[in-house]
């Protein structure tokens, strides 16, 4: 063949092929869904390009995909008359994987076949799924608008290399022939192939036809029979659509193997006319946190496909939402640049955002278990919402879930509505603490007084929490209050002490002055506190001071961190504080004060500037 050359697969392709064949074999029939889905995409792309260049149809505007098989040759062929590919596109699409993060994704694969199967499904195997059932795959293709002699031949046994060559192909589009492995004869059975196509492809708008052979007058007559509904699912009446159809359509557009958690299908008429079909996946995509992760909705205008991954219709904190929007108000020649500045886009974004938040609120109300699944997968992303979307902050806040002293569990199951319903009489604020871990939050000395008073505290231990709480300032008219910061409401609780305690506290004023003199400007203030029960001392920050957790976030991001000036608070009822106050020897007094401060700093920050000095001091005082 003219222009023939043999090329090696990109190393990631070889690895993916091996993993896929072994991980997906139990669900091998999906190869047909994937190949028909690709054909549907090729038809969508041709329709879009033909809007500005109708000649691309080459006189054949009836788009379809045809499936045929040859029992003697043991081949199955899927052919479309969509946009097709030129030689460079064949090499790019069939010889390499252009997705960023592919290498790290493949390295994450392990020996758990069920988990690997889900991960590969999320990754989107597309064309390569043909090798699950075929030991050789042949592709013949020609790009729409190219001359017949610019056709391309591609063939591979999926073992490290492929052959590409130039051919003459009179009709545009792509024809994929699978040379089936031994034992895969079920895919040469007419009834079996029909049932798979009906199962997976009823929802797509592209007609799927199967070859029909009949004997007439001693001759074989070939005709094509359409076997799917070939009506875009979102254009149908909701009452006519079964859950299975919604699930299969999700898998088609999301390239996912698992059913979604929930969906919302709506047709809106009036000032704006559009149809939306929005899905919440049941698991996070493998590249959710990748900077180059593509997200957004499929965009159709008047049922004509325009683009994938139109991120302009969803805020970033809802980037996990999959689905489509079909608008009657946007122009057919719309571009990403036009979308960015369009009033129609902004209005649609606002409406769709509210729709998703309502869908999540309904899921949380109707099925707490499913909502927990959602929260575990996407809670960290949703926590970006309060900072990004002030207009919907209250709705987002209702969807947040936290660990709490009420449940005594690290599971984030407590809603803010739950918390408010349990607030004590006279309690005006929602108390929370941020820490590096659930254990650090749960065992923080800042909680001692509130525990004693039976006041619930939210335990926040995700890295994003401190940043989120800078924007989430109130809920249901109740202000949020970090228990690690100085605050009147906490001091008010702490000041509920008897007269004898006040007298004892007055007697300790000279001790407080000694500590202030010793520490100087290393701390912002030294004072006695009654907010502690078991701990001798803590450090807190002023309301306007940067918190410890925020300082850690700045440091982790490589930014300069201003020095945090702490308030050093001492528990006058604790034996170590009393012993320190009674110590007259200045050197010994200094050692005790430094130990108490180091303990408080260690509890607050989880680290010390000089841990060896801390250990030396503690050992020395233990034996003295």
From Swiss-Prot:
Compartments, record wording: Cytoplasm
Positions of region (C): 553-624
InterPro entries per record: HATPase_C_sf, Heat_shock_protein_90_CS, HSP90_C, Hsp90_fam, Hsp90_N, Ribosomal_Su5_D2-typ_SF
UniProt keyword annotation of Glycoprotein present: no
Keywords assigned: ATP-binding, Chaperone, Cytoplasm, Nucleotide-binding, Stress response
Region (B): 337-552
Recorded superkingdom: Bacteria
Broad class of where this protein is predominantly found: cytoplasm
Entry GO MF terms: ATP binding; ATP hydrolysis activity; ATP-dependent protein folding chaperone; unfolded protein binding
GO (cellular component) term, any one: cytoplasm
Ranges where the record places region A: 1-336
SUPFAM superfamilies named among the record's database cross-references: ATPase domain of HSP90 chaperone/DNA topoisomerase II/histidine kinase, HSP90 C-terminal domain, Ribosomal protein S5 domain 2-like
Keyword Chaperone: yes
PROSITE patterns, alphabetized: HSP90 (PS00298)
Database matches in NCBIfam families: PRK05218.1
UniProt similarity note: Belongs to the heat shock protein 90 family.
Quaternary structure (record): Homodimer.
Function (record text): Molecular chaperone. Has ATPase activity.
Official protein name in the record: Chaperone protein HtpG
């Amino acid at each position: 063949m003219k222009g023939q050359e043999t090329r090696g697969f990109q190393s990631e392709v070889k690895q993916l092929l091996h993993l896929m064949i072994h991980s997906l074999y139990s669900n091998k029939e999906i190869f047909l869904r994937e190949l028909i889905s690709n054909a549907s995409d090729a038809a969508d792309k041709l329709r879009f390009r033909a809007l500005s260049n109708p000649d691309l149809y080459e006189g054949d505007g009836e788009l379809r995909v045809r499936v045929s098989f040859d029992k003697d040759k043991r081949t199955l062929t899927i052919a479309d008359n969509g946009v097709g590919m030129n030689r460079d596109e064949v090499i790019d699409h069939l010889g390499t994987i252009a997705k960023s993060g592919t290498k790290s994704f493949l390295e994450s694969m392990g020996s758990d076949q069920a988990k690997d199967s889900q991960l590969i499904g999320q990754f989107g195997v597309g064309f390569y799924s043909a090798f699950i059932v075929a030991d050789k795959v042949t592709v013949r293709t020609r790009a729409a608008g190219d001359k017949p002699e610019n056709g391309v031949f591609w063939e591979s046994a999926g073992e490290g290399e492929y052959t590409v060559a130039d051919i003459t192909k009179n009709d545009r589009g792509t024809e994929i022939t699978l040379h089936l492995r031994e034992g895969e004869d079920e895919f040469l059975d007419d009834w079996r192939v029909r049932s798979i196509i009906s199962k997976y492809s009823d929802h797509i708008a592209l007609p799927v036809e199967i070859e029909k052979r009949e004997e007439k007058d001693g001759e074989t007559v070939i005709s094509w029979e359409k076997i799917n509904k070939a009506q875009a699912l979102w254009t149908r009446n909701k009452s006519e659509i079964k859950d299975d159809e919604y699930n299969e359509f999700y898998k088609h557009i999301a390239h996912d193997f698992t059913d979604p958690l929930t969906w919302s299908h709506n047709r809106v008429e009036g000032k704006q006319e559009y149809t939306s079909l929005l899905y919440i996946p049941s698991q996070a995509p493998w590249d959710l946190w990748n900077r180059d992760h593509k997200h957004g909705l499929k965009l159709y205008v008047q049922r004509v496909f325009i683009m994938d991954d139109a991120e302009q219709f969803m805020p970033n904190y809802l980037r996990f939402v999959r689905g489509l929007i079909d608008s009657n108000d946007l122009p057919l020649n719309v571009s990403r640049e036009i979308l960015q500045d369009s009033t129609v886009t902004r209005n649609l974004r606002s409406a769709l955002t509210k729709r998703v938040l309502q869908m999540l609120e309904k899921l949380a109300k109707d099925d707490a278990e499913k909502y927990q699944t959602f929260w575990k997968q996407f809670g960290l992303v949703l926590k970006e919402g309060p900072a990004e979307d002030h207009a919907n902050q209250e709705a987002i806040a209702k969807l947040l879930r936290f660990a709490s002293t009420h449940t005594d569990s690290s599971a984030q199951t407590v809603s803010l509505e739950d918390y408010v319903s349990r607030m004590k009489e006279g309690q005006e604020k929602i108390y929370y603490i941020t820490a590096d871990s659930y254990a650090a939050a749960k065992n923080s000395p800042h909680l001692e007084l509130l525990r004693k008073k039976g006041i619930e505290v939210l335990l926040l231990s995700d890295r994003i929490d401190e940043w989120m709480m800078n924007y989430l300032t109130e809920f249901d008219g109740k202000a949020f209050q970090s228990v690690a910061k100085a605050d009147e409401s906490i001091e008010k609780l702490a000041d509920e002490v008897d007269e004898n305690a006040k007298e004892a506290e007055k007697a300790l004023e000279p001790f407080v002055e000694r500590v202030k003199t010793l520490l100087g400007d290393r701390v912002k203030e030294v004072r006695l506190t009654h907010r502690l029960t078991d701990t001798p001392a803590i450090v807190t920050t002023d309301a306007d001071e940067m918190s410890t957790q925020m300082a850690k976030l700045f440091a982790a991001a490589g930014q300069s961190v201003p020095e945090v000036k702490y308030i050093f608070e001492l528990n006058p009822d604790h034996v170590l504080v009393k012993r320190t106050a009674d110590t007259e020897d200045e050197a010994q007094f200094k050692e005790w004060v430094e130990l108490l401060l180091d303990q408080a700093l260690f509890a607050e920050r989880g680290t010390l500037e000089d841990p060896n000095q801390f250990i030396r001091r503690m050992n020395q005082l233990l034996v003295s």
